[in-house]
Amino acid sequence: MIDDQDLGFIANFLGIFIFALVIAYHYVTADPKYEAT
């Protein structure tokens, strides 16, 4: 069974994971003409 502690850990992990995916997706699909030095 999943208790409150596991549920909080899963929610926190998913939040961080999805946030990281969004950041990575933004940097990959950002304006290709822009080159960061």
From Swiss-Prot:
Summary of the function given for this chain in its UniProt record: Subunit of the oligosaccharyl transferase (OST) complex that catalyzes the initial transfer of a defined glycan (Glc(3)Man(9)GlcNAc(2) in eukaryotes) from the lipid carrier dolichol-pyrophosphate to an asparagine residue within an Asn-X-Ser/Thr consensus motif in nascent polypeptide chains, the first step in protein N-glycosylation. N-glycosylation occurs cotranslationally and the complex associates with the Sec61 complex at the channel-forming translocon complex that mediates protein translocation across the endoplasmic reticulum (ER). All subunits are required for a maximal enzyme activity.
Side Cytoplasmic, residues: 29-37
Family, as annotated: Belongs to the OST4 family.
Residues in the Lumenal compartment per record: 1-7
Cysteine pairs bridged by disulfides in the record: none
Membrane topology: Single-pass type III membrane protein
Gene Ontology CC annotation, any one: endoplasmic reticulum membrane
Gene name per UniProt: OST4A
Protein name stated in the entry: Dolichyl-diphosphooligosaccharide--protein glycosyltransferase subunit 4A
Keyword entries, A-Z: Endoplasmic reticulum, Membrane, Signal-anchor, Transmembrane, Transmembrane helix
Record carries keyword Cell cycle: no
Bilayer-spanning residue ranges: 8-28
Oligomeric and partner information: Component of the oligosaccharyltransferase (OST) complex.
Subcellular location as annotated: Endoplasmic reticulum membrane
Superkingdom per UniProt: Eukaryota
